[in-house]
A protein has these predicted regions:
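Core beta-strand elements of the Rossmann-like FAD/NAD(P) dinucleotide-binding domain
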Residues: 12-14, 160-170
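Conserved phosphate-binding and hydrolysis motifs of nucleotide-dependent enzymes
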Residues: 20-25, 169, 175-176
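Glycine-rich FAD pyrophosphate-binding loop
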Residues: 33-53
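Active-site-adjacent segment of FAD-dependent monooxygenases/related oxidoreductases
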Residues: 53, 58-128, 229-231
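Conserved FAD-binding catalytic core of PHBH/FMO-like flavoproteins
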Residues: 125-126, 133, 150, 170, ...
Length: 275
């Protein structure tokens, strides 16, 4: 991975600037590096966020990983998912959405579970292979200036306070839901109106719990919808709807969390035995 040494005191130039080094930005940087395209990646944070977030990708993502020669490394970190079951309040099976357990036309399984920090580490470590790619951490973009045939990116080195700039043929915003790039270029974001509150509980099992099952489970409860997700290794996730007017401080108390995870509408033991 190359070093960006020309931005302090003079205008550095590169083909592409990627703002944000999450999964999308890191994957794009690997693809550009594969083709020898000079790329500068600017990432605000000093390290990868170490808590679970996204948990699922498909065979097309594995095909991309294969393209940049990271599929073999990733295979040891993922879990092939057999699908998802939808059940009612009593645990009665409403829909069995099975995912094939054989490789499809992309050459990979259709459904994978993953742990995002591990996945991001694979992608970011992969950047070290490409001399044309430079990653700068602790850098925050604050302005984009459109020229006739380029874009000037102005950013701050948060470690030193230095104000730097770089000219690129293209700028790609991979900076998440609150994207500064989206706002600076005036691109609208469609609001689909889903503003419900959910409690997300990520857990690591201390002992085998075979009754939880290998499928993810969507509990279609009239009283309190919930989701159970089978993650990688011993990782499991429960997502529980917070009802209108319900106090967030109360529902996050350990006794209340356990009660909701073990209620008939959100207990994977009930659904897996009934399914």
């Amino acid at each position: 991975m190359g070093n960006d040494t020309g931005c302090n005191g003079q205008m550095h130039e590169t083909d592409i600037v990627i703002i944000g080094c999450g999964p999308v930005g890191a994957m794009l940087a690997n693809l550009l590096g594969l083709h020898g395209i000079s790329t500068l990646v600017l990432e605000r944070e000093a390290a990868i966020y170490n808590l679970p977030r996204a948990v699922h990708f498909d065979d097309e993502v594995m095909r991309l990983l294969q393209t940049v020669d990271l599929a073999e490394t990733t295979q040891g970190l993922v879990h092939v998912s057999p699908g998802m079951k939808f059940v009612d309040d009593t645990g009665r099976l409403l829909l069995d959405w099975a995912r094939p357990l054989e490789r499809g036309p992309q050459g990979w399984y259709p459904s994978y579970r993953f742990h995002q920090p591990e996945f991001e580490r694979v992608l970011r470590n992969g950047l070290a292979r490409w001399p044309s790619v430079s990653l700068k951490l602790r850098t925050e973009v604050f302005a984009l200036e459109q020229e006739s045939d380029a874009v000037v990116v102005r950013y701050e080195d948060l470690s030193t306070g230095a104000l730097l700039k770089c000219r690129a043929g293209y700028v790609v915003g991979c900076d998440g839901a609150r994207s500064l790039v989206r706002r600076l270029i005036g691109a609208p974001m469609e609001d689909l109106g889903f503003h419900e509150r959910w409690l997300v509980l990520d857990a690591i099992l201390r002992r085998p719990c075979s009754h939880l099952g290998d499928h993810s489970v969507q509990h279609c409860s009239r009283k309190r919808p919930a989701t159970y997700v089978r993650g990688t290794g011993n990782r499991r996730r429960w997502e529980i709807a917070v009802l209108p007017g319900e106090d967030e401080a109360a529902i996050t108390q350990p006794t209340k969390v356990c009660s909701n995870c073990c209620s008939p509408g959100s207990n994977p033991r009930t659904s897996s035995s009934s399914a």
